[in-house]
Amino acid sequence: MIPGEYQLKKGDIELCVGRDSFVIEVANTGDRPIQVGSHYHFAETNSALSFDRKKAYGHRLAIPAGTATRFEPGQKREVSLLPYAGLRRIFGFRGEVMGALDDNSDSGETR
């Protein structure tokens, strides 16, 4: 093996198999490009992005880890969103959640 070399299984690798996703229309109403990373809580993105934030709550872009989607000024496009998995607790971003995404989480913190 060469340092940094990847040795992948033969065939296609499917991401997020069995996870429910949905498509949502997003418009950049601002005058500057906006880039959103793969694991950013989509409901907390830049306020110049216009979309149903309530529907996007607890979701992230359905794109490979480490990548991003760019929204140019005036651009309208559809994106796929996936629900966060695991403990469903998020911290940071714009500070709108800072804990459990769901009221029934055992974390002791709710939105």
Curated annotation (Swiss-Prot):
It comes from Psychrobacter cryohalolentis (strain ATCC BAA-1226 / DSM 17306 / VKM B-2378 / K5). This is Urease subunit beta. GO terms for biological process: urea catabolic process. Heterotrimer of UreA (gamma), UreB (beta) and UreC (alpha) subunits. Three heterotrimers associate to form the active enzyme. GO terms for cellular component: urease complex. It is found in: Cytoplasm. It catalyses: urea + 2 H2O + H(+) = hydrogencarbonate + 2 NH4(+). Keywords: Cytoplasm, Hydrolase. The gene is ureB. Its EC number is 3.5.1.5.
